[in-house]
């Protein structure tokens, strides 16, 4: 199993690469790519960690050598948020980066599963889909927007509030991956109940958690370490499913049946071909139904922006 990380010299990429080097199954290959000249050195640094994961780093304009034979490609390349920016302000720079990298994936490893981490995910996934479609290699079961950070944050905040072990809590999060499009389904967390006020406050905190980190870092960056952990969790789940493990479920942002929007984050059963089954979002509370209806315009606009970027 070969995993490629594109954007591997950045804050998320390095954290992700470290976690994959220590946690991928023995015999896996890990390939790091970034435009930055430091990238082969990041791979050398990680190669000193004693795990049975082969690692190589590549830099420069051409990602092809890193992508050859990849089964999973995780893309975190792009610029990070600064205070006062929201994820959509990143669009102007990151759209071009994602388009270029996905074009290279389409040429070199068209059958790979692709996880898009680069923000704004609501839009960059639509860009990736249109690029793959133009190249004639789009498979909607193999393209994912990685929203796992919303899930791990929800798990952490709920566990803190309710005095639970964080490992015992699993909150499904649906919709998209910015602002109001992030909808944690708190009504579906087993064995925990919330007041209306708690639901409103928690939902808001989960939606704004990225900003909490950007502000706390005081201009020095955005959420890189928790995002690295979230991306590793998703990537490792995907690898396990591709290798035939049964019953692997993760939420991610994928093209579905279009009931809510063309792309939508929901629980997915993963398998040897990527998405095996898009699972139902279940029964929503009145608060959640309302929030779902309220986000769809924003989500659809974000998606249209990505489609237009490629097709203009």
Curated annotation (Swiss-Prot):
Look up the record and report any one GO term of the cellular component aspect: cytoplasm
Gene3D superfamilies per UniProt: Lactate dehydrogenase/glycoside hydrolase, family 4, C-terminal, NAD(P)-binding Rossmann-like Domain
- Name the chemical reaction catalysed here: (S)-malate + NAD(+) = oxaloacetate + NADH + H(+)
Q: What are the catalytic residues?
A: 177 (proton acceptor)
According to UniProt, the name of this protein is Malate dehydrogenase
The signal sequence is none
Per its database record, what is this protein's job? Answer: Catalyzes the reversible oxidation of malate to oxaloacetate.
UniProt xrefs under NCBIfam families: MDH_euk_gproteo
- UniProt KW keywords: NAD, Oxidoreductase, Tricarboxylic acid cycle
Species of origin: Escherichia coli (strain SMS-3-5 / SECEC)
Supply the PROSITE patterns for this chain.
MDH (PS00068)
Instruction: Supply the gene name.
Output: mdh
């Amino acid at each position: 199993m070969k995993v490629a990380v594109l954007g591997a010299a950045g804050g998320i990429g390095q954290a992700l690469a470290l976690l994959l080097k220590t946690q991928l199954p023995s015999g896996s290959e890990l390939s790091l790519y970034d435009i930055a000249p430091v990238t082969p050195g990041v791979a050398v640094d990680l190669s000193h960690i004693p795990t049975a994961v082969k690692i190589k780093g590549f830099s420069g304009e051409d990602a092809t050598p890193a992508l050859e034979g990849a089964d999973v490609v995780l893309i975190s390349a792009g610029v990070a948020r600064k205070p006062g920016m929201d994820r959509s302000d990143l669009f102007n720079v990151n759209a071009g980066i994602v388009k270029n990298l996905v074009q290279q994936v389409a040429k070199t490893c068209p059958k790979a599963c692709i996880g898009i981490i680069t923000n704004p995910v609501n839009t960059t996934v639509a860009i990736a889909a249109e690029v793959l479609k133009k190249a004639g290699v789009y498979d909607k079961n193999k393209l994912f927007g990685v929203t796992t950070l919303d899930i791990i944050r929800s798990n952490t905040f709920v566990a803190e509030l309710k005095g639970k072990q964080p490992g015992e809590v699993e909150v499904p999060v649906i919709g998209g991956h910015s602002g109001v499009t992030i909808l944690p389904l708190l009504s579906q967390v087993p064995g925990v109940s919330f007041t209306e006020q708690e639901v409103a406050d928690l939902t808001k905190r989960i939606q704004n958690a990225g900003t909490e980190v950007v502000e706390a870092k005081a201009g020095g960056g955005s959420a890189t370490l928790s995002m690295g952990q979230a991306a590793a969790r998703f990537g490792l789940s995907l690898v396990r499913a591709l290798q035939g493990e049964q019953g692997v479920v993760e939420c991610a942002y994928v093209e579905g049946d279009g009931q809510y929007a063309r792309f939508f984050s929901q629980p997915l059963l993963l398998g040897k071909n990527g998405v095996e089954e898009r699972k139902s979002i279940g029964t929503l509370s009145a608060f959640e139904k309302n929030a779902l209806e309220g986000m769809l315009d924003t989500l659809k606009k974000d998606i249209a922006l990505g489609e237009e970027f490629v097709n203009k």
